A protein has these predicted regions:
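Small-residue-enriched alpha-helical segments and adjacent helix-cap loops
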Residues: 64, 91-258
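Iron-sulfur (Fe-S) cluster-binding modules
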Residues: 1-94, 110, 255-265, 271
């Protein structure tokens, strides 16, 4: 076999670059907000407690996405309220993270009651197997998210620049194979959750503990992701999760009996 050729520089040619390396570009404003607010805290509690407005600050609005919350306003009332010299009719949407779209009867009943008592009376089922409240007033926001957590559900990472709700076949009781893929779906969802303690400190009321383990995000880092990331798990022959429309897909490989999960084929780059 011929050896690889060795290329030597021309004696009259400089081996150093003519121009210095480009300086690192400054972070986009949204990335700066994430990096400068330790682990998605920011002034959220202060903003929620501010009764002078129905909205929150722009910076907090960038952080609440990671907590599953978006600010909204009633467009139909904009002109009327502007003429009256009032601010927009602000409210909030909260998205509940439901891996595989599975919840218990008790959880559904609790969410249905919250939709009537704290939102606009609707509970929406999204195309990505999550649930959404709309029309939550700021004064009801903490109580709503706290009640969702007391029902053993949460809104963490339902929105924002993180891995979103992980989808799977919507009927895990269809077979033992479907139940096994649902367990994998839940494991993926748990593994990709942000590790910040801010969510439970703010919405559940966990105490700040001094001297504990330093907080870190081993998967995401301090700026989390540049954009959202979506994962699905499919059980052939069904493609009910629309696997090619997502960033990362796992297609179950089964044995000849069709009952035992052997592994997964992996798809990437959808969306």
């Amino acid at each position: 076999a011929k050896p690889f050729p060795t290329f030597l520089p021309n004696p009259g040619m400089s081996t150093t670059p003519d121009t210095p390396p480009a300086a690192a570009k400054p972070l986009h404003k949204n990335e700066t907000i994430k990096s400068e607010r330790p682990f998605l805290r920011g002034p959220l509690l202060r903003d929620i407690a501010d009764h002078s407005t129905g909205a929150i600050t722009e910076d907090s609005g960038q952080l609440t996405k990671f907590h599953g919350i978006y600010g909204q306003d009633d467009r139909d009332l904009r002109n009327q309220r502007r003429k009256e010299g009032k601010e927009k009719a602000f409210s909030f949407m909260a998205r509940i993270r439901v891996p595989g779209g599975v919840c218990t009867t008790a959880q559904w009943v609790a969410l249905d009651a919250l939709a009537d008592s704290h939102a606009n009376g609707t509970l929406k089922l999204t195309t990505r197997q999550a649930f959404q409240f709309h029309g939550i007033l700021k004064g009801d926001l903490w109580r709503t998210i706290n009640a969702v957590n007391r029902a053993l559900l949460d809104t963490l990472a339902a929105c924002g620049d993180v891995n979103r709700n992980v989808m799977c076949n919507p009927n895990p009781e269809q077979s033992a194979l479907h139940a096994e893929t649902m367990r994998v779906t839940k494991a993926i969802a748990d593994h990709r959750l942000p590790r910040t303690r801010a969510y439970r400190e703010i919405w559940v009321g966990d105490d700040l503990v001094a001297g504990g383990e330093p907080e870190s995000e081993p998967i995401y880092g301090k700026t989390y992701l540049p954009r959202k990331f979506k994962i699905v798990v499919a059980v052939p022959p069904s493609n009910d999760v629309d696997i090619y429309a997502h960033d990362l897909g796992f297609i179950a490989i089964v044995d000849d009996s069709g009952k035992k999960l052997l592994g997964f084929n992996v798809t990437v780059g959808g969306g």
